[in-house]
């Protein structure tokens, strides 16, 4: 009942209007799994490689017909009659078939879409939700928790066409007792911010991840506007709401000058100066999480930042670790950061993603499951966060259905499990938040 009978791949459109890969895995008994791959804008140099056609006559070279044909003509043959419930075996067949370190032969976008579709089909064959199947693969059957969301409300950097340098300004509703309540709080603050921007005559257009994308004078102005928006609600900043930022510092770093350049403010910092700039922001505002606060290759800068801030702030490695357990192990050994951002397509298979999560947890590093800026309606990361009890999720703002699809799936899962079987720990999930 769980043998793979056929795999069908197709080219679909992501949230930025770019092509991506969708795979459909069919099993004996009529069970089907459907999954698609997301795509990033600010990417780590060591991420698994997306395969693009490079044909400028189609989709400005971003087509994925080559990846689709590799699934239909190679991966489907290699996986035919294999047991979909053996996720690790399936993923390693694809890894071996690819034969490269960064999945450049078949493409991480091709491999991931199949990997997730296999997991969904296997879950269907066991007549269980995806999150429950993931927990079983993860060797933690029946163990679940609901994640605290990082809700993006202002977009900057590569995620928006504005002059804000920091890529994401997020809120975390720490006083919420359930995921559903945290989502409601996020919606209310999102709308309060929209009204405030209108009052100020500012743009309420949104960026790639659904947060507002106004032109502002500085990163501090973004934090001040968020602070003012929260004051218009019944919630208190610091008590009910804490802040998180994603610097995406690799996008700010000039390797030749060894400087971090905030172009919107016309300021440059050395590595240490940038850490102290972030330290001052965290002293002025209740920031509990900073992601990619240094360039991905500036490990010395990350080590210094961890010494300065790691005991009081969640320091998250995204481009730094690229969901790679081996790179993460090196970071753990050196004492760099204290948390990891998990993105399925950075590594390219569900199995390797689970290995990275396990490695982080064993080292007492925080885990945040994340979307990408180019998303689809696929809500697998919601199930991944619950099935691995990862504690936090970052999946954009309260607009754009490619973002809200994940929040809505969390609401369904929480309703299905109930708080007894899937507790919501809120603030306790944030590393170094006390």
UniProtKB/Swiss-Prot annotation:
Signal peptide: none annotated. The lineage of its organism: Bacteria, Pseudomonadati, Pseudomonadota, Gammaproteobacteria, Enterobacterales. It is found in: Cytoplasm; Secreted; Cell surface. PROSITE patterns: ENOLASE (PS00164). It is an enzyme of class 4 (lyase). Belongs to the enolase family. InterPro entries: Enolase, Enolase-like_C_sf, Enolase-like_N, Enolase_C, Enolase_CS, Enolase_N. (2R)-2-phosphoglycerate binds at residues 167, 343, 372-373, 394. The gene is eno. The active site is at 209 (proton donor), 343 (proton acceptor). It comes from the Bacteria. GO terms for cellular component: cell surface; extracellular region; phosphopyruvate hydratase complex. Its cofactor is Mg(2+). Gene3D superfamilies: Enolase-like C-terminal domain, Enolase-like, N-terminal domain. Catalyzes the reversible conversion of 2-phosphoglycerate (2-PG) into phosphoenolpyruvate (PEP). It is essential for the degradation of carbohydrates via glycolysis. Pathway: Carbohydrate degradation; glycolysis; pyruvate from D-glyceraldehyde 3-phosphate: step 4/5. Mg(2+) binds at residues 246, 291, 318. Component of the RNA degradosome, a multiprotein complex involved in RNA processing and mRNA degradation. One of its GO terms (molecular function) is magnesium ion binding. It catalyses: (2R)-2-phosphoglycerate = phosphoenolpyruvate + H2O. The keyword Lyase applies. One of its GO terms (biological process) is glycolytic process. It comes from Buchnera aphidicola subsp. Acyrthosiphon pisum (strain Tuc7). This is Enolase.
């Amino acid at each position: 009942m769980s043998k793979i009978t056929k795999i069908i791949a197709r080219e679909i459109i992501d949230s930025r209007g770019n092509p991506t890969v969708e795979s459909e895995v069919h099993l004996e008994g009529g069970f089907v799994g459907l999954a698609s791959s997301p795509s990033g804008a600010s990417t780590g140099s060591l991420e698994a490689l997306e395969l693009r056609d490079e044909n400028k006559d189609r989709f400005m070279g971003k087509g994925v017909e080559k990846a689709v044909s590799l699934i239909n003509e190679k991966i489907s043959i290699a996986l035919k009659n294999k047991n979909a419930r053996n996720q690790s075996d399936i993923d390693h067949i694809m890894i071996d078939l690819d034969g490269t370190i960064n999945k450049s032969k078949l493409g991480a976008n091709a491999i991931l879409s199949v990997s997730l579709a296999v997991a969904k089909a296997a879950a269907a064959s066991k007549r269980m939700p995806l999150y429950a199947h993931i927990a079983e693969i993860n060797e933690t059957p029946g163990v679940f928790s609901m994640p605290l969301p990082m809700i993006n409300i202002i977009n900057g950097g590569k995620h928006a066409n504005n002059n804000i340098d920091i890529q994401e300004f997020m809120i975390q509703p720490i006083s919420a007792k359930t995921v559903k309540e945290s989502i409601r709080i996020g919606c209310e603050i999102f709308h309060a911010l929209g009204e405030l921007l209108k009052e100020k005559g500012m743009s309420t257009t949104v960026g790639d991840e659904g947060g507002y994308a106004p032109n502002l004078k500085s990163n501090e102005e973004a934090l001040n506007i968020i602070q003012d928006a929260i004051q218009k609600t019944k919630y208190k900043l610091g008590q009910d709401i804490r802040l998180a930022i994603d610097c995406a510092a690799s996008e700010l770093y000039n390797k030749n000058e060894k400087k971090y350049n905030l172009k919107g403010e016309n300021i440059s910092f050395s590595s240490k100066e940038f850490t102290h700039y972030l330290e001052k922001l965290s002293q002025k505002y209740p920031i509990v999480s900073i992601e990619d606060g240094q360039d991905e290759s500036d490990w010395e800068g990350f080590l210094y930042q961890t010494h300065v801030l790691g005991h009081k702030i969640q320091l998250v490695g995204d481009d730094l670790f690229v969901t790679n357990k081996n790179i993460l192990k090196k970071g753990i050994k050196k004492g760099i950061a204290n948390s990891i951002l998990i993105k399925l397509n950075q590594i390219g298979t569900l199995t390797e993603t689970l290995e990275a999560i396990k490695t982080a947890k064993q080292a007492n590093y925080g885990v945040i499951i994340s979307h990408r800026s180019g998303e689809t309606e696929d809500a697998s990361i919601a199930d991944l966060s619950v099935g691995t009890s990862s504690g936090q999720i970052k999946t954009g703002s309260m607009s754009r259905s490619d973002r809200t699809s994940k929040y809505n799936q969390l609401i369904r899962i929480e309703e299905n499990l109930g708080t007894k079987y899937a507790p919501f720990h809120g603030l306790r999930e944030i590393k170094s938040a006390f």
